[in-house]
């Protein structure tokens, strides 16, 4: 039992694969094949220029303005080689990426969708982009789960908030119809002091689909919106 692989490695965004991927690889070396295909990352228009299969897949999807879904297996040894300083926007919900692909096609700015709490494939993709020198801007749902996801991404990758502050919530709150549950003791938004208090006071959730026009405008203009 002492020889079993350890799943608890603390891998960071500096080019390393996330712990779950390294764990699968260590099992594989002992003859136990773990699933590298059931988790994937969704992206649009990443400016990859590296050699290899995965970079080529990303490049060709960008030429057509089409979303690409990459498995953990594809990402494990990939080198995307996006230009340093590339701003990659990150959203929580695939509907944002789908609308960007449909309406903007190849004109949309680079976008990654975490589809909830980031899985090991999403972390692997973001690690590769971070290692290439990409910068990140994050938007998610204004609800308690959305804040937890945002905290993970913003703290791990130093992402800028993208229309995800107090003023953005207050501007959208009048359109809110879904009531929030009580926030609980752990609710926090370190990048936006006062956001938890504003959400608690107004007691409505604002999901990305409700501010989709603003997000799409940023994606076509390529401008930073904090």
What does each model-identified segment do?
Residues 1-113, 118-131, 145, 155-160, ...:
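Nucleic-acid enzyme cleavage-core boundary/entry regions
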Residues 133-143:
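Acidic beta-strand-to-loop metal/phosphate-binding motif
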Residues 165-166:
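Catalytic cores of secreted/periplasmic or lumenal enzymes
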């Amino acid at each position: 039992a002492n020889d079993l692989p350890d799943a608890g490695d603390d891998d960071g965004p500096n080019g390393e694969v996330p712990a779950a991927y390294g764990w699968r690889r260590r099992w594989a070396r002992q003859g136990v094949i773990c699933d590298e295909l059931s988790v994937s990352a969704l992206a649009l228009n990443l400016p990859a220029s590296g050699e290899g299969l995965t970079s080529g897949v990303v490049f060709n999807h960008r030429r057509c303005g089409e979303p690409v879904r990459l498995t953990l297996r594809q990402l494990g040894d990939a080198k995307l080689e996006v230009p340093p300083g590339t701003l990659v926007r990150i959203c929580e919900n695939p509907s944002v990426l789908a609308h960007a692909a449909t309406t903007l096609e190849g004109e949309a700015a680079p976008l990654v969708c975490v589809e909830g709490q980031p899985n090991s494939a999403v972390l692997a993709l973001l690690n590769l982009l971070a290692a290439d020198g990409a910068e990140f801007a994050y938007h998610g749902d204004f609800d308690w789960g959305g804040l937890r996801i945002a905290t993970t991404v913003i703290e791990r990758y130093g992402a800028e908030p993208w229309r995800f502050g107090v003023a953005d919530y207050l501007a959208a709150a009048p359109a809110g119809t879904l009531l929030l549950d009580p926030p609980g003791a752990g609710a926090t938004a370190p990048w936006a002091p006062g956001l938890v208090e504003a959400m608690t006071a107004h007691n409505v959730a604002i999901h990305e689909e409700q501010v989709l026009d603003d997000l799409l405008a940023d994606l076509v203009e390529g401008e930073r919106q904090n």
